[in-house]
Amino acid sequence: MAKEEPPSVSRDLQELQRKLGLLLESFLNNSKVVAFMKSPVGRFLDRHPFVTLTVLMFVTMSAIPVGFFLLIVVLTSLGALMGAILLEGLVISVCGLSLLCVLCGLGFLSLALSGIAMMSYVVVSCLMSYWFSPSRPLTQQNANVDCQLAMKFTESERLIF
């Protein structure tokens, strides 16, 4: 039985060698490979098989680290994109709350200024109607006396209440 296995193994190896030869021939007859082999880089690699093997091994072994690096770059970019979106949302929220506070403050300030303006209008119109009433003519001296009396009257009211 030991003598029967070697002819079978040798036939299998010959078949494998023939298939690899056909594969190599079809590979070398490919138009893109022919164009590459006619280029200066292809001619250099054809004349220097050790360099060709070294480059082939380097490219093969560097595929996994380059793949991991590209994966990390993509994941970091996605993380940065999400971080920028979250940061943008945070900035918009903080600015929105700041704007709300400023607008509320301006609303209260406008209410206070409107109240002061309305009270000033009422006081000035009452004083104008009192000073310049058609029923009694006032002189400058009488107006000053009336203002002083009004001031004393309001001070006495403050003391009473």
From Swiss-Prot:
<feature type="topological domain" description="Lumenal">
    <location>
        <begin position="62"/>
        <end position="67"/>
    </location>
</feature>
<keyword id="KW-0256">Endoplasmic reticulum</keyword>
<feature type="topological domain" description="Lumenal">
    <location>
        <begin position="111"/>
        <end position="116"/>
    </location>
</feature>
<dbReference type="GO" id="GO:0005789">
    <property type="term" value="C:endoplasmic reticulum membrane"/>
</dbReference>
<comment type="function">
    <text>Plays an important role in the formation of lipid droplets (LD) which are storage organelles at the center of lipid and energy homeostasis. In association with BSCL2/seipin, defines the sites of LD formation in the endoplasmic reticulum.</text>
</comment>
<dbReference type="GO" id="GO:0005811">
    <property type="term" value="C:lipid droplet"/>
</dbReference>
<comment type="subunit">
    <text>Interacts with BSCL2/seipin to form an oligomeric complex.</text>
</comment>
<feature type="topological domain" description="Cytoplasmic">
    <location>
        <begin position="1"/>
        <end position="43"/>
    </location>
</feature>
<dbReference type="InterPro" id="IPR029709">
    <property type="entry name" value="LDAF1"/>
</dbReference>
<feature type="transmembrane region" description="Helical">
    <location>
        <begin position="94"/>
        <end position="110"/>
    </location>
</feature>
<keyword id="KW-0472">Membrane</keyword>
<feature type="topological domain" description="Cytoplasmic">
    <location>
        <begin position="88"/>
        <end position="93"/>
    </location>
</feature>
<comment type="similarity">
    <text>Belongs to the LDAF1 family.</text>
</comment>
<feature type="topological domain" description="Cytoplasmic">
    <location>
        <begin position="134"/>
        <end position="161"/>
    </location>
</feature>
<dbReference type="GO" id="GO:0140042">
    <property type="term" value="P:lipid droplet formation"/>
</dbReference>
<keyword id="KW-1133">Transmembrane helix</keyword>
<keyword id="KW-0812">Transmembrane</keyword>
<keyword id="KW-0551">Lipid droplet</keyword>
<feature type="transmembrane region" description="Helical">
    <location>
        <begin position="44"/>
        <end position="61"/>
    </location>
</feature>
<feature type="transmembrane region" description="Helical">
    <location>
        <begin position="68"/>
        <end position="87"/>
    </location>
</feature>
<feature type="transmembrane region" description="Helical">
    <location>
        <begin position="117"/>
        <end position="133"/>
    </location>
</feature>
<dbReference type="Pfam" id="PF16015">
    <property type="entry name" value="Promethin"/>
</dbReference>
<protein>
    <recommendedName>
        <fullName>Lipid droplet assembly factor 1</fullName>
    </recommendedName>
</protein>
